[in-house]
């Protein structure tokens, strides 16, 4: 058999030698001369105790019986770099070592046990044991006895291990640090925990007297009892269990025959000797397994040739392995798979592990986490969670359809990692065993990552990362995050546990200003919007939003879609208030020339051309119409000269306050306003004028009218249009006065419950204004007449939607009434349990009901006629609930059968449908009706 070559004067291992039972202290004695290990009394059991974190006396061998005490003192004074020389001198002084050893010293004995546990090679193919340092004929090593190899597999194994062990610059017995997690660890404190505990009874020098440790004795007795219990029951396991601490079962000499293990478990040969079959598993038969102990930690992995690491790096490797195997680490199997070894490695095929002892092993059981909790792990940083990759793994079916990436360290996932000066934490119960803190912290971290309803996309659109927030007021939009933040784990809708989980994880208070309609403090924001310096991320819908820096700087409230210096006609930068409306100089001159020249402009299209900064000169007819709709009149500059002008104030004492950036009563005029010097003038209320200014522009469906209509193409085009309209609804709601004062969950919930009502209501208004209710005006490029409705597969649904424009024609609804009714539709459905900001919601809804009454009063004179009109309009709003319910049912059925029908649903729309439509159809929402049925 090929012998392994040793470096320098060291002799190779003796092939076929018996395995040594001295697992805990491989450097301190020589193997027995006979086929069986020598006897060892229980009073020579090595101590397992905490040692100080220092290099003095850690890597030095225990003197043999024939060694001179002066040599021991000389060895204690050596540095870490002279370890090899120390072992050379130890070889020269051997002679009477025998099979027994002197009582171990505390520091070196524990180190031997720890290093044997952490650095033992896992190659099952080694058939020769590793003799201790006292043996002249073998080279020193830091490992325990090797696993026995069956005779047929020995040559193949030696062929594999020989080039690895003889590689240049490496020592015999080198092992990978990652194999540390696969060794059988003693019950109780892990080696990493023991090293980090303060050494109250262990001196810093190796020559100090030894004090017995009752804890270590208890641990070893427990292991011995466990080994005896394993003899009676249990299947045959591959490999052999390790005798912990070098003690045999029962405390006496253990005769280990070649075919049996020390614990009574017979050895089973491997299936394959060429490392192609599954590896021999070294399993400790514990029934039941102690909680906090990983079953994967008992599995032997392949031999990986890595040079011997220093102590801190070895612990780092073992701790990293525990981190990757710990299920309490937020990410579970998905997070472990993201950092798992290659598929060829036996670790890749290992079973999932139980909760390990990772989070608590860095602290004493009676201490709180400190800033220097990781002094031995150099620049160790916890890897970032990749939630989206986790969702694509084995747990994707148990989680939400979609989740978003969190870059960087997440305090909700790493509750015990101090990130800067931590806030005061609640008193933590002392864990009774390693891994208990990880178990208790798992629900807190899981609540954030599993908050997977569809509200995150809407929340990302509602709140965008900005610079310094503007001056806040009662209706000011709250800033989403502090400057410098880079990403955000956004919580999903309807999970009140999110804030609690972040508080339990020790996260800093969230950034959400205390806003209220009447100065009342606003409810706390979700814990997802984190402090400055923590990650935040948003999906690609942000280009639809306007930054908060462009918002109005009003001391009362500001609106992101109505900056103070934006032209209300084309969107260019406004130069002032011209002819009663805030416009740019170009639109001012155009309106003056068009009105004074009395031009008869005609639109070449359908009177719905887009008027913006680039295309404002394309169609003068549509531009002039938009000027008139905004309230521009030539006599607007001469209002102060008329004595009989009576201004109707828009808001009473209980209504919403007026912003500074909104034109006042003497500036905003009604559409197509004409007057004479002796005529009373009534002006549009400022809030109504504001609702006109934030009304979304025309949205196109992108439908190809050159191709024949098919059911799938029409439905796909409608879904694309619905996605764009949903984004438009979110942007519109951000600019709505009072809406941003509601809790973020309430905002998302209201949009999700009312988006279908808002879309069909807008469809009815466009059909009423553009085609007089004769067709369904979905978009300028998607207009369905009755013939196209009949050819589609949803003709009955089209007839249902057609009722709305017909009601508009019957009632002759004005634009002011439509705008107020549209806001009330946003506020007409709430959850059964109510909203978090229920008081602010009710005040906001009451304010817009009053605005609807004022809009009715602009056309209806008298109390009776106004009351009748109010009844008709509110009755129409109540009837929309039943109509929209039919649309919800059809939409959900189409979404479920989308693959069979070849219909595409966009991402954001799919999330809202999957998350909220089942709730609405199941009656889990409360419609707000004006009249009893």
Curated annotation (Swiss-Prot):
Phosphorylated on multiple serine sites. Several of these sites are hormone-dependent. Phosphorylation on Ser-294 occurs preferentially on isoform B, is highly hormone-dependent and modulates ubiquitination and sumoylation on Lys-388. Phosphorylation on Ser-102 and Ser-345 also requires induction by hormone. Basal phosphorylation on Ser-81, Ser-162, Ser-190 and Ser-400 is increased in response to progesterone and can be phosphorylated in vitro by the CDK2-A1 complex. Increased levels of phosphorylation on Ser-400 also in the presence of EGF, heregulin, IGF, PMA and FBS. Residues 165-305 are annotated as: Mediates transcriptional transrepression (in isoform A). The modification Phosphoserine is found at residues 20, 81, 102, 130, 162, 190, 213, 294, 345, 400, 676. Gene3D superfamilies: Erythroid Transcription Factor GATA-1, subunit A (3.30.50.10), Retinoid X Receptor (1.10.565.10). Changing residue 58 to A: Reduces transcriptional activation. Changing residue 388 to R: Great loss of sumoylation. Completely abolishes sumoylation. Loss of CUEDC2-mediated protein degradation. Increased ligand-dependent transcriptional activity. Transmembrane segments: none annotated. Changing residue 118 to A: Reduces transcriptional activation. Residues 679-913 form the NR LBD domain. A motif (Nuclear localization signal) lies at residues 183-187. Progesterone binds at residue 766. The steroid hormones and their receptors are involved in the regulation of eukaryotic gene expression and affect cellular proliferation and differentiation in target tissues. Depending on the isoform, progesterone receptor functions as a transcriptional activator or repressor. One of its GO terms (cellular component) is mitochondrial outer membrane. Changing residue 59 to A: Reduces transcriptional activation. The gene is PGR. Disulfide bonds: none annotated. GO terms for biological process: cell-cell signaling; glandular epithelial cell maturation; lung alveolus development; maintenance of protein location in nucleus; negative regulation of gene expression; nuclear receptor-mediated steroid hormone signaling pathway; ovulation from ovarian follicle; paracrine signaling. This is Progesterone receptor. Residues 232-241, 335-350, 430-452 have a biased composition (Low complexity).
């Amino acid at each position: 058999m090929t012998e392994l070559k040793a470096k320098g004067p060291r002799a190779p291992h003796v092939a076929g030698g018996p395995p040594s039972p001295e697992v805990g202290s491989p450097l301190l004695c020589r193997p027995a001369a006979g086929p069986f290990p020598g006897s060892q009394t229980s009073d020579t059991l090595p101590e397992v105790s905490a040692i100080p974190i220092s290099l003095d006396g850690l890597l030095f061998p225990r003197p043999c019986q024939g060694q001179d005490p002066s040599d021991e003192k000389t060895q204690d004074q050596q540095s870490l770099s002279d370890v090899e020389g120390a072992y050379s001198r130890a070889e020269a002084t051997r002679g009477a070592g025998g099979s027994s050893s002197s009582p171990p010293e505390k520091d070196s004995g524990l180190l031997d046990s720890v290093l044997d546990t952490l650095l033992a090679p896992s190659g099952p193919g080694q058939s020769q044991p590793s003799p201790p340092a006292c043996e002249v004929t073998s080279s020193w090593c830091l490992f325990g006895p090797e696993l026995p190899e069956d005779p047929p597999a020995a040559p193949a194994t030696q062929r594999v291990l020989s080039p690895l062990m003889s590689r240049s610059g490496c020592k015999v017995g080198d092992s990978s640090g990652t194999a540390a997690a696969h060794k059988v660890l003693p019950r109780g404190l892990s080696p990493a925990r023991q090293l980090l505990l303060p050494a109250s009874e262990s001196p810093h020098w190796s020559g100090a007297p030894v004090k017995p440790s009752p804890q270590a004795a208890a641990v070893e007795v427990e292991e011995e009892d466990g080994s005896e219990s394993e003899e009676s029951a249990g299947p045959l396991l591959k490999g052999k269990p390790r005798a912990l601490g070098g003690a045999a079962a029962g405390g006496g000499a253990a005769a280990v025959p070649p075919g049996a293990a020390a614990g009574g478990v017979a050895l089973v040969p491997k299936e394959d000797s060429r490392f192609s079959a599954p590896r021999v598993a070294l399993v400790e038969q514990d029934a039941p397994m102690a909680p906090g102990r990983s079953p994967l930690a008992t599995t032997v992995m392949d031999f990986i040739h890595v040079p011997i690491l220093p102590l801190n790096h070895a612990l780092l490797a073992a701790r990293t392995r525990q981190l990757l195997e710990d299920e309490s680490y937020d990410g579970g199997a998905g997070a472990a798979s993201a950092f798992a070894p290659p598929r060829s490695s036996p670790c890749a095929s290992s079973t999932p592990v139980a909760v390990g002892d990772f989070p608590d092993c860095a602290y004493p059981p009676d201490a709180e986490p400190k800033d220097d909790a990781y002094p031995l792990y150099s620049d160790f940083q916890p890897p970032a969670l990749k939630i989206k990759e986790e969702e694509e793994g084995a747990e994707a079916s148990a989680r939400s359809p979609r989740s978003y990436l969190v870059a960087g360290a997440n305090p909700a996932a790493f509750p015990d990692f101090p990130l800067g000066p931590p806030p005061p934490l609640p008193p933590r119960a002392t864990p009774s065993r390693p891994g208990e803190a990880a178990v208790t912290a798992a629900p807190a971290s899981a609540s954030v990552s599993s908050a997977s309803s569809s509200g995150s996309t809407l929340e990302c659109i509602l709140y965008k990362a900005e610079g310094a927030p503007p001056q806040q007021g009662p209706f000011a939009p709250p800033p989403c995050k502090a400057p410098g933040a880079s990403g955000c784990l956004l919580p999903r809708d309807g999970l009140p546990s999110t804030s609690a989980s972040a508080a339990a994880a020790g996260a800093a208070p969230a950034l959400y200003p205390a806003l209220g309609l009447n100065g009342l403090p606003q409810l706390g924001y979700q814990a997802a919007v984190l402090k400055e310096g923590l990650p935040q991320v948003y999906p690609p819908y942000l280009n639809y939003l306007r930054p908060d820096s462009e918002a109005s700087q009003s001391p009362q409230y500001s609106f992101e879609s109505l900056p103070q210096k934006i032209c209300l006609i084309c969107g260019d930068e406004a130069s002032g208030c011209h002819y009663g409306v805030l416009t740019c100089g170009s639109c001012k001159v155009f309106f003056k020339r068009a009105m004074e020249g009395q031009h008869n402009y005609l639109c070449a299209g359908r009177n719905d051309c887009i008027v913006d900064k680039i295309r404002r000169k394309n169609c003068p007819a549509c531009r002039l119409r938009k000027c008139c709709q905004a309230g521009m009149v030539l006599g607007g500059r001469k209002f102060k000269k008329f004595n009989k002008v009576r201004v109707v104030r828009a808001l009473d004492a209980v209504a919403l306050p007026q912003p500074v950036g909104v034109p006042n009563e003497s500036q905003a005029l009604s559409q197509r306003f004409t007057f004479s010097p002796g005529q009373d003038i009534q002006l549009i209320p400022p809030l109504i004028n504001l609702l006109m200014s934030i009304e979304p522009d025309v949205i196109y469906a992108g439908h190809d009218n050159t191709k024949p209509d098919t059911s799938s193409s029409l439905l796909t085009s409608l879904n694309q249009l619905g996605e764009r309209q949903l984004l438009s609804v979110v942007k519109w709601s951000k600019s709505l006065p009072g809406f941003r004062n509601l809790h973020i969950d309430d905002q998302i919930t209201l949009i999700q419950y009312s988006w279908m009502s808002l879309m069909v209501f807008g469809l009815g208004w466009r059909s009423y204004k553009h085609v007089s209710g004769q067709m369904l005006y979905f978009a300028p490029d998607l207009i369905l007449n009755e013939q196209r409705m009949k050819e589609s597969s949803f003709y009955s649904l089209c007839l249902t939607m057609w009722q709305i424009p017909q009601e508009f024609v019957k009632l002759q609804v004005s634009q002011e009434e439509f705008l107020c009714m549209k806001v009330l539709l946003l506020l007409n459905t709430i959850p059964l349990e109510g909203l978090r900001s229920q008081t602010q919601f009710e005040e906001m809804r009451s304010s817009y009901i009053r605005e609807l009454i004022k809009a009715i009063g602009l056309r209806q004179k008298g109390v009776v006629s106004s009351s009748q009109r109010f009844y008709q309009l509110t009755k129409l709003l109540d009837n929309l609930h039943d109509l929209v319910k039919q649309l919800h049912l059809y939409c959900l059925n189409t979404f479920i059968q989308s693959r069979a029908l070849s219909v595409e649903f966009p991402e954001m729309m799919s999330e809202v449908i999957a998350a909220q439509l089942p709730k609405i159809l199941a009656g889990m929402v409360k419609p707000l009706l004006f009249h009893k049925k």
